[in-house]
Amino acid sequence: MTGRQALSLGHKGARVTNSTANGVNAVVILVVEDELFLRVDITGCLREAGYVVVEAASGEEAMAVCQSNSSIDMVFTDITLMGSLNGWDVAERFRMQRPDAPVLYASADAIDRERCAPGSVFIAKPYRPDDILTACQGLRPR
């Protein structure tokens, strides 16, 4: 079965798009980005590549999505987010549920690279779609 289906998760702004390629379910990525235009670009790029994408516009929303969706395989999070939870908080809490799950951090501040947890990847803003796909493919869960 090939197709796409948008489902509401009951969280303001949260959305999951389910896409399948050749009958095989894709990796589910939670994208946490508070800047709408960046989030649209990131999720569009990942969806076109066949990933299943769950979106969140804040750290708090990301945590609510994680609690209601246990199928998330990896997280792509901006480090600087609006609200009380930043990208570090999102990754730490996500890894409490899924210790071996990969995390891709994004930031315009290169010094943030040094703080990334082992097994994570850092991508510097601004980035190109190819940078996103390369990073996600390198982190792809087993």
Regions picked out by a protein language model, each given a short descriptive name:
Residues M1-L30, L36-F37, D100, V121-A124, ...:
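Non-catalytic signal-transmission and effector/linker regions of two-component phosphorelay proteins
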Residues L36-V54:
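Two-component/phosphorelay signaling modules centered on CheY-like receiver
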Residues E55-M74:
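Acidic, metal-coordinating helix/loop segments flanking the phosphotransfer/catalytic sites
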Residues S58, L85-V90:
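Acidic catalytic/metal-coordinating carboxylates
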Residues N69, A110-S120:
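Short loop/helix-cap segments at secondary-structure boundaries that form the rim of catalytic
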Residues D78-I79:
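Active-site residues of response regulator receiver
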Residues W88-P99:
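Short amphipathic alpha-helix used as the core "switch/output" element in two-component signaling
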